[in-house]
């Protein structure tokens, strides 16, 4: 209902409905099984390469084995379907005791950065409705990052700044929402920086 109440939410649902339209359960299973095989093989290759050379770079790994085959196919039973993570991980056990929320997410929302602010605000409101109306919500602002493809004239390097702005705007316009800056913590062509200690310490400083 919350997603259907806004244009951004309806767009999110429409993309999902288009992705699954006209497919049978057999097709969903075949797509998922084929993806899982590719994903497992890729992970095995990466693990073996890192064991052989702990200092191997992602640039080298991507050249040898290609980019990670992510995301998985969209299916009605996927954990990444609309509201899937909420239904599977939160709704069944909420509300449990907590002091606030730590949110480090947004990397894969790059294609839909224009609606991210609205969807993030809806998420904060929905979660607070379950737990407490004014629970602190701490956002890790996306770090510096440039995909190698951008240097090869593909992609748009200005989409992540739009996401950062949306995260910042949420903190400025919603009570008890805060942003932790990590613009100095990113890594070239590595969407998940190795350094997690720095963001963790900054979150702790803000929370405590």
Task: Specify the residue positions occupied by each region the protein language model found.
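Cell-envelope and extracellular/periplasmic
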Residues: 1-208
């Amino acid at each position: 209902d919350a997603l259907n109440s806004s244009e951004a939410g309806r767009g999110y649902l429409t993309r999902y409905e288009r992705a699954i339209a006209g497919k049978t359960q057999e097709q969903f299973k075949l797509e998922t099984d084929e993806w899982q095989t590719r994903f497992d093989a890729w992970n095995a290759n990466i693990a073996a390469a890192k064991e052989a050379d702990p200092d191997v770079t992602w640039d080298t790994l991507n050249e040898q084995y290609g980019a990670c085959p992510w995301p998985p196919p969209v299916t009605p039973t996927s954990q990444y379907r609309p509201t899937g993570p909420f239904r599977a991980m939160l709704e069944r056990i909420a509300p449990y005791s907590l002091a606030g929320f730590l949110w480090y997410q947004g990397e894969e929302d790059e294609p839909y950065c224009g609606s991210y602010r609205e969807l993030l605000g809806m998420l904060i409101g929905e979660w607070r409705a379950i737990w407490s109306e004014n629970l602190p919500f701490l956002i890790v602002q996306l770090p510096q990052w440039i995909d190698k493809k951008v240097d090869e004239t593909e992609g748009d390097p200005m989409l992540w700044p739009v996401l950062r702005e949306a995260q910042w705007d949420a903190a400025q316009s919603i009570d008890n929402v805060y942003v932790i800056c990590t613009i100095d913590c990113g890594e070239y062509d590595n969407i998940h920086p190795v350094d997690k200690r720095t963001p963790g310490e900054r979150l702790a400083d803000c929370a405590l």
